[in-house]
A protein has these predicted regions:
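Short hydrophobic/aromatic patch on the recognition helix
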Residues: 29, 33, 78-79, 83
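…primarily DNA-binding HTH/wHTH and HhH modules…
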Residues: 81-91
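Core residues of bacterial helix-turn-helix
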Residues: 21-22, 71
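Terminal helix-turn-helix DNA-binding modules in bacterial transcription factors
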Residues: 3, 7, 12-16, 35-77
Length: 91
């Protein structure tokens, strides 16, 4: 499951679609993530996306709008807001 998420985090992954992919119930997936990672599936995906974006911002001259898209965000304003919150949390 984790490798699938790590390979596809840039795409939209809903709990329902994820469950269908692995033939698991949404409830089981939610419980699994809470028990093993202490976060939800969507929080895990957000973390992967933001860490990917952070790496691109540090290592490339790619514009923020492009980095947002490459990290799975269609709305640049939302990406910037979430990214700032994530960076403040890490301080």
């Amino acid at each position: 499951m984790i490798s699938y998420i790590q390979q596809n985090f840039k795409e939209k992954i809903s709990l329902k679609e994820f469950g269908e992919q692995f033939h698991l119930s949404e409830k089981y997936i939610s419980r699994y993530f809470k028990e093993h990672f202490h976060i939800t599936l969507s929080q895990y995906i957000t973390h992967l996306r933001l860490e990917h974006a952070k790496q691109l911002l540090q290592d490339t001259d790619t514009p923020v709008t492009e980095i947002a898209m490459q990290s799975g965000y269609q709305n640049v304003s939302y990406f910037i807001r979430i990214f700032k919150k994530h960076m403040e949390f890490l301080r």
